[in-house]
Design a protein with these regions (language model features):
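Glycine-rich phosphate/adenosyl-contacting loop at the front of the ribokinase-like
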Residues: 2-69, 78
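Intrinsic disorder/low-complexity segments
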Residues: 9, 59, 138-141, 150
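Structural motif
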Residues: 16-18, 145-149
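Short glycine-rich anion-binding loops that position phosphate/pyrophosphate groups of nucleotides
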Residues: 21-23, 99, 120-122, 151-152
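Conserved N-terminal subdomain of the carbohydrate kinase-like
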Residues: 37, 61-145
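Short, basic, glycine/proline-bearing loop/turn elements
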Residues: 38-43, 120, 149-151
Length: 152
């Protein structure tokens, strides 16, 4: 199934998703997680994430032209770049010094429990925020839709 967003003039639209604080989502499955003990992981999954990144991925899956922007740490950006290339998402993130935020999910399927651990994010400077503001201004165009999503 393919969905295309069209205006009254039948021109295809572009959606810009803005994710100020994207995250690498690490999901670790551990059956019978025991706190204070050594546990053996069953699996590890790492995905590019953040609300706006997830929205962009879904839109791209439906064939909708999508641009992503926000602030992305230079360290840990590879998973995002790979996803954007694979899904043909136009990457316009402003790269900033530091590591992209990581969120760890510890999933215990035996108990049906999930524990979330959210790590700190790279700190944006005034120059980073000015660069993002300029990027947003450059992306503003008639017929473009913007989705602002996620945490600051």
């Amino acid at each position: 199934m393919s969905i295309t967003i069209r205006s009254a003039t039948n021109a295809a639209r572009v959606v810009v998703t803005v994710t100020p604080n994207p995250a690498l989502d690490q999901t670790v499955r551990v059956a019978g997680l025991a706190l204070g003990a050594v546990n053996q992981a069953e699996s590890l999954e790492i995905n590019a994430g953040g609300k706006g990144v997830n929205v962009a991925g879904c839109l791209a899956d439906y064939g909708i032209a999508t641009i992503v922007t926000g602030l992305l740490g230079r360290e840990g950006s590879e998973a995002f770049e790979t996803m954007f290339a694979r899904k043909r998402i136009d990457d316009r993130f402003v790269r900033i010094a530091g590591r992209t935020r990581t969120n760890v999910k510890l999933v215990d399927p035996a108990r049906g429990q999930t524990t979330d651990i959210n790590l700190a994010t790279a700190r944006a400077t005034a120059q980073d925020l000015a660069a993002l503001e300029a990027r947003l201004a450059s992306l503003a165009a008639p017929g473009r839709w913007f989705v602002l999503a996620g945490s600051l």
